[in-house]
């Protein structure tokens, strides 16, 4: 599921001296608006659902599916034996809940757009606005943009309050979700720091020394008991 990340202002970039003298990540103050982010990484099962959908809709265009497949050769490294991971990591049921790897930026962006359409399609189907079409093809599969353009006719059995007088849902009705996307570099670093709760007037004034929210050596959270770096 998605978790809300409260926005704020923080110092982005390296805050310690660069031992290699690269200085390619100089600290600067950045303001991040509130946003939502997945609580966990996209799993192999999530991405396999995407591949399965592409295989069904683009069954006559195997190159579309091929271009979406992750690069499993990323597991190969010199002086190591990772052939089992190359061969089974993505598809074996044992790794279904593991994060998908070997996905390029373009592939991840395409997945995010696909996910946006599938989520909004399910919302409309659950609300009775649309009936699910099991026979979608490359020429008639659902997209949010095509629906908002008026290319779909809503059902007469839609739930009260979900549609306008023309039985259509608009973005301003608050039912459809905005498009999923990859986080920006600032959003990713801000979320990874986990500094919510350490703000003063929307400003992050201190970074965490330890994984827990305090400068003490011990934490009351059982997950961190025994953790000491």
Where are these regions (language model features)?
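A short glycine-rich, aromatic-capped structural motif
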Residues: 1-86, 96-120
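Functional-site microenvironments in short loops/helix caps that host divalent-cation chemistry
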Residues: 4-5, 11, 16, 86-99, ...
């Amino acid at each position: 599921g998605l978790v809300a990340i409260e926005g704020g202002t923080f110092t982005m970039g390296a805050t310690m001296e660069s031992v290699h003298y690269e200085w390619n990540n100089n600290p600067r103050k950045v303001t991040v608006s509130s946003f939502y982010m997945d609580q966990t990484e996209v799993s192999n099962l999530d991405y396999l659902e995407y591949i399965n959908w592409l295989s069904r809709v683009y069954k006559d265009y195997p190159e579309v599916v091929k271009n979406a497949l992750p690069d499993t050769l990323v597991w190969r490294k010199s002086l190591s034996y990772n052939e089992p991971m190359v061969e089974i990591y993505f598809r074996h049921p044992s790794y279904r809940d593991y994060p998908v790897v070997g996905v390029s930026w373009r592939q991840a962006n395409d997945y995010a757009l696909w996910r946006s359409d599938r989520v909004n399609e399910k919302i409309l189907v659950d609300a009775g606005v649309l009936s699910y079409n099991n026979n979608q093809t490359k020429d008639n599969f659902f997209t949010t943009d095509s629906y908002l353009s008026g290319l779909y006719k809503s059902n007469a059995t839609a739930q009260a309050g979900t549609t306008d007088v023309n039985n259509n849902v608009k973005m301003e009705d608050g039912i459809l979700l905005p498009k999923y996307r990859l986080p920006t570099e600032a959003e990713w670093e801000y979320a990874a720091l986990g500094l919510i709760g350490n703000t003063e007037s929307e400003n992050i004034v201190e970074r965490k020394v330890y994984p827990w929210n305090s400068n003490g050596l011990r934490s009351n959270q059982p997950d961190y008991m025994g953790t000491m770096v």
